[in-house]
Amino acid sequence: SLSASQQAKYPHLKDAAAFALPSGKDLKPLLKGELVAIGTDADGILQGATLVQSAGALDALYSEAATKLTYGAIVEGGNVTFRLWAPTAKSVKLALFDEQHNAIGERAMTQDEASGSWSVQGGSDLVGKYYRYDIQVYHPVSRKLESYQVTDPYSLSLAMNSEFSQVVDLDDPALKPEGWDSLKAPHSQKNPADITIYEAHVRDLTGNDESTPVEHRGKFLGLTDSDSVPVTHLKSLAKSGVSHLHLLPVFDIATVNEDPAKVANIGDDFSKLCEVNAEVKNSKFASHCGGGETI
């Protein structure tokens, strides 16, 4: 049966049967591929099989060392250290790109057996460059070893549409807003009962506001226009006792194209919608694509 500590961590499994591998078995290489638990009868005839869920094993084997490390593109002491936690990966390479996102090189990364992380170090010339990780990893859906090029889950900066991660130094004065180092929170965060929250949608807050510059509407930049009607309203709320502004959604939305050249909005020619969305040309709206109408 599971130990007391295991039952506490996985209470939904406390009544399940527990099995153990032979002592001395190196589990880490096994977690890089397909793991199947099988049951046989006394004659060794297969009676059943199931795929193994490895999340608990990964935590047990790697978490102590892994949680002591810093991840991402770390700028420190004139060097840039790239570190990614990918214990199940067969191999990881750092793929580098210039400002136009042209490939400029690739560097092999080394895995740390204790933490399961992969890392490689470069010079300060990499600050400002874009990068991705080339990963070879077993995928449980395809049940094959797959190759992927992915952005860094620990990214501090990303290119348009989050297609490339970027190396940035957050201590660089050029990246700090004026007065950033002396900025202090206007309200204490210690007692949640003293917090009064106003919730707002990033787009809706300024999206249709005529006092906000067109190029800032519906964007974070809309909050920087101190004399606009929405921001003036927020200031009045602050004077009335509102202490915190909760913006949402602030995560990356893959279905929203950030490239203005590939976006069609209300008021644009319908033909532009046909250009940016090929499916429209194959729909019942196809006849409108060359009619000079607006959306």
Regions found by a protein language model. Name each.
Residues 1-2, 92-96:
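Extended low-complexity, serine/threonine- and proline-enriched intrinsically disordered segments
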Residues 2-77, 81, 112-225:
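The feature marks proteins involved in alpha-glucan
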Residues 5, 101-108:
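Surface-exposed loop/edge segments in extracytoplasmic proteins
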Residues 85-91:
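Short proline/glycine-enriched turn/loop motifs at strand-loop junctions of beta-rich domains
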Residues 94-97, 132-134, 142-150, 208-213, ...:
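Short, solvent-exposed loop/turn and secondary-structure capping segments
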Residues 211-225, 257-295:
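Aromatic- and acidic-residue-enriched carbohydrate-binding clefts of CAZyme catalytic domains
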Residues 231-250:
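Catalytic domains of carbohydrate-active enzymes, especially glycoside hydrolases
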